[in-house]
């Protein structure tokens, strides 16, 4: 049995977001992190590994520098990693990305007892589409918004978050799950894990490795094969600075009334 976890390197949106003159994100000038929801998916896989001894494989699609993120996943406890990277894959939207990742997972083999895990969504797009699209292309049953996961043999029980509560679903493996932050608290890398990470396999899968898969076609991958594209990204205008009024209730009310009167609001 193995668990394949799809992770993504994303811009750290907690810092300043840089935008190019053409409206696209200037990713080169921004710090990158592992997508937070993907970290929860990885932690869920590692917990099952701790309990069962299964193998955990991490996969990402991205440029060569994303290998550093994969090393971090290996340091956390994953057993092997695959970087799916090629110029032909550049500019892919969620549809094209899911085509490529599904082909990569098909190459690795998704067998009877296996589970595929993804984060709910990536913070750079917030679409929550890639995981379900991979499941559709690989003909896997899927459960999204997993807040609790229990595996018993070839059956997985998932507590799925809804807008106003939860529902419990049972599914047979192989299956795909998307995970949310409420699922767990990701572990930290250990010093020993960092050293061990460089002894674990990290393999690059390029276009030549995947081109024979029926999902890989020039019309369905990369920028040209993407039905959607980002027209423009922009930072919203900065809001006005807030004002703090100090004093007792009567005093602050008088100050506020004076300010509103000066602005002809009252």
Each language-model region and where it sits:
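N-terminal glycine-rich FAD/FM-binding segment characteristic of electron-transfer flavoproteins
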Residues: 1-266
């Amino acid at each position: 049995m193995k668990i394949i976890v799809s992770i993504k390197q994303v811009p750290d949106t907690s810092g300043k977001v840089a935008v190019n003159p053409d409206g696209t994100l200037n990713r080169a000038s921004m710090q990158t992190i592992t997508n937070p929801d993907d970290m929860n998916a990885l932690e869920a896989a590692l917990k099952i590994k701790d309990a069962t001894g299964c193998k955990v494989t991490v996969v990402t699609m991205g440029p060569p520098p994303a290998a550093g993120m994969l090393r971090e996943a290996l340091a956390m406890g994953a057993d092997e990693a695959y970087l799916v990277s090629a110029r032909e894959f550049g500019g892919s939207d969620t549809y094209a990305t899911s085509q490529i990742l599904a082909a990569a997972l098909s190459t690795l083999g998704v067998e009877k007892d296996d589970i595929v895990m993804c984060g709910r969504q990536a913070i750079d797009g917030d679409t929550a589409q890639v995981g379900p699209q991979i499941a559709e292309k690989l003909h896997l049953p899927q459960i999204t918004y997993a807040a609790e996961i229990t595996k018993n043999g070839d059956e997985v029980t998932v507590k799925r978050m809804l807008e106003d509560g939860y529902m419990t679903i049972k599914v047979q493996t192989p299956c795909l799950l998307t995970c949310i932050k409420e699922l767990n608290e990701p572990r930290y890398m250990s010093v020993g894990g960092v050293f061990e990470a460089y002894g674990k396999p990290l393999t690059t899968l390029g276009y030549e490795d995947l081109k024979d898969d029926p999902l890989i076609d020039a019309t369905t991958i990369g920028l040209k094969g993407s039905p959607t594209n980002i027209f423009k990204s922009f930072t919203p205008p900065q809001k006005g600075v807030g004002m703090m009024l100090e004093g007792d209730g009567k005093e602050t009310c008088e100050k506020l009334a004076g300010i509103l009167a000066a602005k002809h609001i009252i």
